[in-house]
From Swiss-Prot:
Keyword Lyase among record annotations: no
Recorded superkingdom: Eukaryota
UniProt GO BP: hemopoiesis; positive regulation of cell population proliferation
Keyword Transit peptide listed: no
GO molecular function: metal ion binding
Complex formation: Interacts with TGFB1I1.
Modification sites for N6-acetyllysine: 23, 138, 144
Organism, scientific name: Mus musculus (Mouse)
Gene symbol of the encoding locus: Crip2
UniProt-listed InterPro entries: Znf_LIM
Domain LIM zinc-binding intervals: 5-57, 126-178
SUPFAM superfamilies in the cross-refs: Glucocorticoid receptor-like (DNA-binding domain)
CDD domains membership: LIM1_TLP
Protein name: Cysteine-rich protein 2
């Protein structure tokens, strides 16, 4: 059964039929609702089920601020090349970042070189004689480098071995008798804050 044209409400036969907006129209009834310009199926805008030409009628009636499209129920069609600038934006960002990475790379080289020069700098100074300590004559104790003959008891001047002596206020002392006499309470070999803890001599227990 033939349908009726929504424009003239008359029967639409196959030979004169065009379909648009989900309806069958007479070919010459498919016109712009405002200017009566004959439209082509799918080549027009729509509002509330009625056809309108894209320009100027639909834009004038329903388009916000002169834009060609807009309003509820309108067909979506191509915009006049507004999205082209968005493509160029992201491309420029990686170029800047790569340049920043290149510039930030070189400064790290000299920092490593300077740290090496500190290790190969001048020898440390002996805390006893305040002279340079070279590798061949160096012994390390109390976190410092000493000349081997300079590592001796602060009281009796006995030559000491690294790690085999007591300490008080950063100065080396022999365990017995000097440290015990100076800082040990009641004749005990060790004592006082800052001293090393070491084993007592078995002979000390025999003596009264």
């Amino acid at each position: 059964m033939a349908s009726k044209c929504p424009k003239c409400d008359k029967t639409v036969y196959f030979a004169e039929k065009v379909s648009s907006l989900g309806k069958d129209w007479h070919k010459f009834c498919l016109k712009c609702e405002r200017c009566n310009k004959t439209l082509t199926p799918g080549g027009h805008a729509e509002h509330d089920g009625k056809p309108f030409c894209h320009k100027p009628c639909y834009a004038t009636l329903f388009g916000p601020k002169g834009v060609n499209i807009g309003g509820a129920g309108s067909y979506i069609y191509e915009k006049p090349q507004t999205e082209a600038p968005q493509v160029t934006g992201p491309i420029e960002v990686p170029v800047v970042r790569t340049e920043e990475r290149k510039t930030s790379g070189p400064p790290k080289g000299p920092s490593k070189a300077s740290s090496v020069t500190t290790f190969t700098g001048e020898p440390n100074m002996c805390p006893r004689c305040n002279k340079r300590v070279y590798f061949a004559e160096k012994v390390t104790s109390l976190g410092k480098d000493w000349h081997r003959p300079c590592l001796r008891c602060e009281r009796c001047s006995k030559t000491l071995t690294p790690g085999g002596h007591a300490e008080h206020d950063g100065q080396p002392y022999c365990h017995k008798p000097c440290y015990g006499i100076l800082f040990g309470p009641k004749g005990v070999n060790t004592g006082a804050v800052g001293s090393y803890i070491y084993d007592k001599d078995p002979e000390g227990t025999v003596q009264p």
